[in-house]
């Protein structure tokens, strides 16, 4: 049980996919202008990442390995992720039309979010079992959501701040992301595996 908690903590904080592995930067920079949108995107991505990790494990274990078709892994994972994202999009559209409008193009873009595919591929390469695969995906999703919401809150504060003209826009956003990455480096050594 402790190993599972450490797995979640290490994927969320220490090996954060956005700040350490630089995966998922497109939604990180694009959806992080308002906290409400970031929370919605974080929830949708959490669902997709967790289910995609489970699905990737099942497809790899029960379809690709028995058929000796591991060379199709990336293509099959992209198709599985696309199906999961479409289901998520339908659920969000039915349950929260406002959130659906706020997320706009970023919801279908979860399909091409490199973090989702990256987590699925890393899960397979790490040879995690079923529970570890789901927890790895969930921890990665928690880390993504945490960073996204924190970054959105910082960007809202920066929008109200008196930022010098050369640093306005993407410049201050990238500087802030770099400082967040440095702050998350403080978690290094938190978990010894």
Swiss-Prot record:
Principal EC category: translocase
GO cellular component, one term: plasma membrane
Compartment(s): Cell inner membrane
Keywords (A to Z) from UniProt: Cell inner membrane, Cell membrane, Electron transport, Membrane, Translocase, Transmembrane, Transmembrane helix, Transport
Membrane topology: Multi-pass membrane protein
EC number in record: 7.-.-.-
Regions crossing the membrane: 5-25, 39-59, 65-85, 102-122, 134-154, 171-191
UniProt GO BP: electron transport chain
PANTHER family registered for this protein in UniProt: INTEGRAL MEMBRANE PROTEIN OF SOXR-REDUCING COMPLEX, ION-TRANSLOCATING OXIDOREDUCTASE COMPLEX SUBUNIT A
HAMAP family to which the protein is assigned, alphabetical: RsxA_RnfA
NCBIfam families per UniProt: PRK05151.1 (NF003481), rnfA (TIGR01943)
Its job: Part of a membrane-bound complex that couples electron transfer with translocation of ions across the membrane.
Similarity-based family: Belongs to the NqrDE/RnfAE family.
Subunit and partners: The complex is composed of six subunits: RnfA, RnfB, RnfC, RnfD, RnfE and RnfG.
Protein name as it appears in the record: Ion-translocating oxidoreductase complex subunit A
Organism of this sequence: Actinobacillus pleuropneumoniae serotype 5b (strain L20)
